[in-house]
A protein has these predicted regions:
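A glycine-rich beta-to-alpha transition motif near the start of alpha/beta enzyme domains, typified by
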Residues: 1-149
């Protein structure tokens, strides 16, 4: 694959880490996403180390999240979760990751996708994998997510 330049944020959510991308920066054809995600994470890696990418060699460190404007009136953002296999060239979109779901509200606020004010934010997240709405409530510090750790 030819090297691409795609803006990304490497973000922690609970015990997981993920490469987080804006949907606007990815090809409209989702069939092209797998190749990009595999390259970004460093899969497949028969040795299970993912040294050529941002993955950490275990499933909790081999994730990609895509965030964009909501397609539903009852949500602020859409969030698509991708679990990238470590040793195989496979990307699974069938589930969700609760740990990374907790990071999508702060990501949306910090990236300016959701406007907030005050000391607390509530971001309504539409998980496109499960078609569920997740409410993320978190503290703010000067208009950004207040994050420790």
């Amino acid at each position: 694959m030819k090297q691409l330049r795609i803006p990304a944020v490497f973000m922690r959510g609970g015990t997981s880490n993920a490469v987080v991308l804006h949907e606007r920066d990815l090809p409209r054809d989702r069939a092209q996403w797998d190749e990009i995600f595999l390259a970004a994470i460093g899969s497949p890696d028969p040795y299970g180390r993912q040294l050529d990418g941002m993955g950490g060699g275990i499933s909790s460190l081999s994730k990609v999240c895509v965030v964009g404007p909501s397609t539903r009136p009852d949500a602020d953002i859409d969030y698509t979760f991708a679990q990238v296999q470590v040793k195989e060239a496979k990307v699974d979109y069938s589930g969700n990751c609760g740990n990374m779901s907790s990071a999508m509200g702060p990501f949306a606020v910090d990236e300016g996708l959701v406007k907030v004010s005050g000391k607390e934010a509530l971001v309504r997240i539409h998980n496109t994998n499960t078609r569920k709405i997740i409410h993320a409530r978190f503290a703010l510090d000067d208009g950004k997510a207040a994050v420790d750790g």
